[in-house]
């Protein structure tokens, strides 16, 4: 049974998030979408782009992610290797009169939730990565991905599941992708660091920001933010909104791990495609939203 917070977005809220200003898409191979007039490119209004976004959501094709590019005034739809030409045509058909607003791009690999401070944490459902240690007064918690805490109750520090860390006290997935675990083991060190990097504050991502990710599978990798407020359809009804898109690689087991920029906490690893041998696209839950939802802070 899934544990969910009661803060799921309404359709109206989703539309607001979708129409937020976005930019900086990663370089991926494009599938050309013909325009009505190639010599004079059309421009599309915010309402048309929102309608196109709703149409892509309604098409419900797993392995897709989309966000608005304010420079070209197009809805950029990224499709992974599992999406067929027929499904791409289905997306275009769903967009109807706004199909010309779509720019469809192909990325290698498959979008997946990456379940299997970066340190490994274990539940009855698998292994994830600890995001950031946080606190509210004298009570200590850690943040991780919501698809990790969804359905998980107790968390351990080792694969043998003999050293208890704590219990899930909140989870928000799908729609969002964050969860919080309250420490119940008072003997566990609760450093406010990620590896050797001290984390002193939290910040919102910006396009082009240099960022670093740490995870229990692949360790530490760096890259940059390529877009904001992306929607990702992982399949099976698991759609998340408002994600940070990056060109930082990640692999299964890295889920929930921290994304940071210097001393600032930025996000929690959600999912993506590719791997750390060939590269890939990875999406992150903004950490400021989770901190606000649970009334906690980094330290």
UniProtKB/Swiss-Prot annotation:
<protein>
    <recommendedName>
        <fullName>Streptogrisin-B</fullName>
        <ecNumber>3.4.21.81</ecNumber>
    </recommendedName>
</protein>
<dbReference type="GO" id="GO:0004252">
    <property type="term" value="F:serine-type endopeptidase activity"/>
</dbReference>
<dbReference type="InterPro" id="IPR001316">
    <property type="entry name" value="Pept_S1A_streptogrisin"/>
</dbReference>
<feature type="disulfide bond">
    <location>
        <begin position="128"/>
        <end position="148"/>
    </location>
</feature>
<dbReference type="InterPro" id="IPR009003">
    <property type="entry name" value="Peptidase_S1_PA"/>
</dbReference>
<dbReference type="GO" id="GO:0005576">
    <property type="term" value="C:extracellular region"/>
</dbReference>
<dbReference type="InterPro" id="IPR018114">
    <property type="entry name" value="TRYPSIN_HIS"/>
</dbReference>
<keyword id="KW-1015">Disulfide bond</keyword>
<feature type="signal peptide">
    <location>
        <begin position="1"/>
        <end position="38"/>
    </location>
</feature>
<dbReference type="InterPro" id="IPR004236">
    <property type="entry name" value="Pept_S1_alpha_lytic"/>
</dbReference>
<dbReference type="GO" id="GO:0006508">
    <property type="term" value="P:proteolysis"/>
</dbReference>
<keyword id="KW-0720">Serine protease</keyword>
<dbReference type="Pfam" id="PF00089">
    <property type="entry name" value="Trypsin"/>
</dbReference>
<feature type="propeptide">
    <location>
        <begin position="39"/>
        <end position="114"/>
    </location>
</feature>
<comment type="function">
    <text>Has a primary specificity for large aliphatic or aromatic amino acids.</text>
</comment>
<feature type="disulfide bond">
    <location>
        <begin position="249"/>
        <end position="276"/>
    </location>
</feature>
<dbReference type="InterPro" id="IPR033116">
    <property type="entry name" value="TRYPSIN_SER"/>
</dbReference>
<dbReference type="InterPro" id="IPR001254">
    <property type="entry name" value="Trypsin_dom"/>
</dbReference>
<comment type="subunit">
    <text>Monomer.</text>
</comment>
<dbReference type="InterPro" id="IPR043504">
    <property type="entry name" value="Peptidase_S1_PA_chymotrypsin"/>
</dbReference>
<keyword id="KW-0378">Hydrolase</keyword>
<keyword id="KW-0865">Zymogen</keyword>
<feature type="active site" description="Charge relay system">
    <location>
        <position position="177"/>
    </location>
</feature>
<comment type="similarity">
    <text>Belongs to the peptidase S1 family.</text>
</comment>
<keyword id="KW-0732">Signal</keyword>
<dbReference type="Pfam" id="PF02983">
    <property type="entry name" value="Pro_Al_protease"/>
</dbReference>
<feature type="active site" description="Charge relay system">
    <location>
        <position position="255"/>
    </location>
</feature>
<feature type="active site" description="Charge relay system">
    <location>
        <position position="147"/>
    </location>
</feature>
<keyword id="KW-0645">Protease</keyword>
């Amino acid at each position: 049974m899934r544990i969910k917070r009661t803060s799921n977005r309404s359709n109206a809220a989703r539309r607001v998030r979708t129409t937020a200003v976005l930019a900086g898409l990663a370089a991926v191979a494009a599938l050309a979408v013909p325009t009505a007039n190639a010599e004079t490119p059309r421009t599309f209004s915010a309402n048309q782009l929102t309608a196109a976004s709703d149409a892509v959501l309604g098409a419900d094709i797993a392995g897709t992610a989309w966000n608005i590019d304010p420079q070209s005034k197009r809805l950029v739809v990224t499709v992974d290797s599992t999406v067929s030409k027929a499904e791409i045509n289905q997306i275009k058909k769903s967009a109807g009169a706004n199909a010309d607003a779509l720019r469809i791009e192909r990325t290698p690999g498959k979008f997946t939730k990456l379940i299997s401070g970066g340190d490994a944490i274990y539940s009855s459902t698998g292994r994830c990565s600890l995001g950031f240690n946080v606190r509210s007064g004298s009570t200590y918690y850690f943040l991780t991905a919501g698809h990790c805490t969804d359905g998980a109750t107790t968390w351990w520090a080792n694969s043998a599941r003999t050293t208890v860390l704590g219990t899930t006290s909140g989870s928000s997935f799908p729609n969002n992708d964050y969860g919080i675990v309250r420490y119940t083991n008072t003997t566990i060190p609760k450093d406010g660091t990620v590896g050797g990097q001290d984390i002193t504050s939290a910040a919102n991502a910006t396009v082009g920001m240099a960022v670093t990710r740490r995870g229990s599978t692949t360790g530490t990798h760096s890259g940059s933010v390529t877009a904001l407020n992306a929607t990702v359809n992982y399949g099976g009804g698991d759609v998340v909104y408002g994600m940070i898109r990056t060109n930082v690689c990640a692999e299964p087991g890295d889920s929930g791990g921290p994304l940071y920029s210097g001393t600032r906490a930025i996000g929690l690893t959600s999912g993506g495609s590719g791997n750390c041998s060939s590269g890939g696209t990875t999406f992150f839950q903004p950490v400021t939203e989770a901190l606000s939802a649970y009334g906690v802070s980094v330290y």
